[in-house]
Amino acid sequence: MPERFLVFIPAYNCEKQVPRVLNQLLDRQVAAMVTECIVVNNRSTDGTEAAVQSWMQAHPQAPVRLLRNDQNYGLGGSHKVAFQYAVQHNFDYLIVLHGDDQGDIRDVLPLVHSGRHRKYDCCLGSRFMPESRIKGYSTPVSYTHLRAHETSLHL
């Protein structure tokens, strides 16, 4: 049975960025990996929801679903919504891709294609790791980090 990947895009007031994020799903390799994508609108006050709906109409082949929180639950609350959705719909893996265009989903492809993702309960990516390509920052940023592919932590 093929592995089921859910992409979760938390969205709050990211009307201009969310179409770029959704466009990442159109990449051939990404589309082959992703079973479904949910965009969780956390009660945006701009045109985020309309931007997602417009994108979905323009790309009906993309397996994207828009969910709207009853109230603004914050980022953590939106994560809970996504985790619950993933469990209820029997997904094997959940990938978080922020709606404000912080990351590139293609960065996870080598991990998935190699099968290394199966060794860990959680894999975290960071744009601030030394080998990351940081875009749009005016000053160098240095962070101490743990590499998810080297360390597994069971909670």
What residues fall within each predicted segment?
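Short, well-formed alpha-helical segments that are part of the catalytic scaffolds
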Residues: 14-28
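A conserved acidic beta->alpha catalytic loop
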Residues: 41-50
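A short, conserved beta-strand element in the Rossmann-like catalytic core
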Residues: 43, 74, 102
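Donor nucleotide-sugar binding loop of glycosyltransferases
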Residues: 14-17, 44, 104
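Conserved sequence signature across two-component system core domains
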Residues: 11, 40-42, 69
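Acceptor/aglycone-binding surface of glycosyltransferases and processive sugar-polymer synthases
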Residues: 69-88, 93, 105-153
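Cell-envelope/extracellular polymer assembly enzymes that use nucleotide-activated donors
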Residues: 4-6, 36
